[in-house]
Amino acid sequence: MSNSSNSTSLSNFSGIGVGVILTLVILFILILALLCLRVAACCTHVCTYCQLFKRWGQHPR
């Protein structure tokens, strides 16, 4: 009797663990995607600033 209840509790725990792991993985992927987007935005800003500086250097006031 105790063995069957033990196995069911273990299977329930493993199912919960799998759900938690999947949730953590999805959150990790979302955070990585947001970081990549932030880095890409920073790179585009830096590129635009570099172009502006180049134009300003080519055409000084």
UniProtKB/Swiss-Prot annotation:
Topological domain ranges for the Lumenal compartment: 1-14
Localization in the cell: Host endoplasmic reticulum membrane; Host cell membrane
Offer a single GO CC term for the protein.
Answer: membrane
Superkingdom is Viruses
Transmembrane helix as UniProt keyword? yes
Primary location class: host cell
Recorded family membership: Belongs to the adenoviridae E3-CR1 family.
Membrane topology summary? Single-pass membrane protein
Cytoplasmic topological segments: 36-61
Q: Does the keyword Zinc apply?
A: no
Q: How is it modified after translation?
A: Only 1 of 3 three potential glycosylation sites is glycosylated. Oligosaccharides are not processed from high mannose to the complex type because the protein is retained in the endoplasmic reticulum.
Note the subunit structure: Interacts with E3 RID alpha and E3 RID beta.
Q: Where exactly are the transmembrane stretches of this chain? A: 15-35
User: What keywords sit in the KW lines?
Assistant: Glycoprotein, Host cell membrane, Host endoplasmic reticulum, Host membrane, Host-virus interaction, Membrane, Transmembrane, Transmembrane helix, Viral immunoevasion
> What is this protein's record name?
Early 3 Conserved Region 1-alpha protein
Q: Which residues are glycosylated?
A: 3, 6, 12
Function statement? Prevents infected cell apoptosis induced by the host immune system. May act by down-regulating host TRAIL receptors. May act in complex with E3 RID alpha and beta. May play a role on cellular apoptosis regulation in the ER.
